[in-house]
Swiss-Prot record:
Protein name: Urease accessory protein UreE
GO BP, sorted A to Z: protein folding
Source species: Yersinia pseudotuberculosis serotype O:1b (strain IP 31758)
GO molecular function, one term: nickel cation binding
CDD domains, per the entry: UreE (cd00571)
Gene: ureE
Compositionally biased intervals (Basic and acidic residues): 204-231
Annotated Gene3D superfamilies: Urease metallochaperone UreE, N-terminal domain
Pfam families (UniProt xref): UreE_N
An annotated GO cellular component: cytoplasm
Amino acid sequence: MILIEHILGNVKKDPVWREKLKDATFDLLILDQREAQKSRCRKSSTQGLDLGISLDRNVVLADGDVLAWDEETNVAVVVQINLRDVMVIDLSELKSRSPDELIKTCFELGHALGNQHWKAVTKHNEVYVPLTVATTMMDSVMRTHGFQHLPFRFVKGAEILPLLTNSEARLLFGGAEDTDTHVHVASPLDEPHGSGLHIHGIHSHGEGHSHGDHDHDHSHSHGDHDHDHKH
């Protein structure tokens, strides 16, 4: 096993490494979005190298990271991360709305995303939602809930990853298929206090839990079945 404790550079972001490896052969270490969030893992490259990744805590691999380079053979071990696509919802339009409309829309959007068990991160007046179903279904949910006035589009996860902190990347890509959702929808005013609206864990599906000093039941449908659960 070859132990990897440091990242040498990034062939996509670092012009020095891009130039250095322009004629090199890439031996890819292909990771899915779950594996990419781990600072320690063991996996073989496409050419069969047994690699043990042991990075510092909170250091995660990025697409294009160079893990090893043999100058004699001109072969570089480079990370390739396969991330799922992301729905990007633009909240900028809400800045022109009244405070009441802004709060109402943010709350309803948070509820709609949470009700679908979709994880989300908000940043730079946008909401990022990793795809867990077909784009046609996500498009339908947005329109069914009356969010046609909010522009949204679908982009590659690799385009969003550089905009995120490590913790945000873990939330968005580290197991987006999980059903225990933590939704975070904020006011597009980008104010840390006061008028900033933050909604966490809009819809969680554990066992019964309480809100304040009361409990209540509700039910909803998933596909071809219904179920009740407590809040």
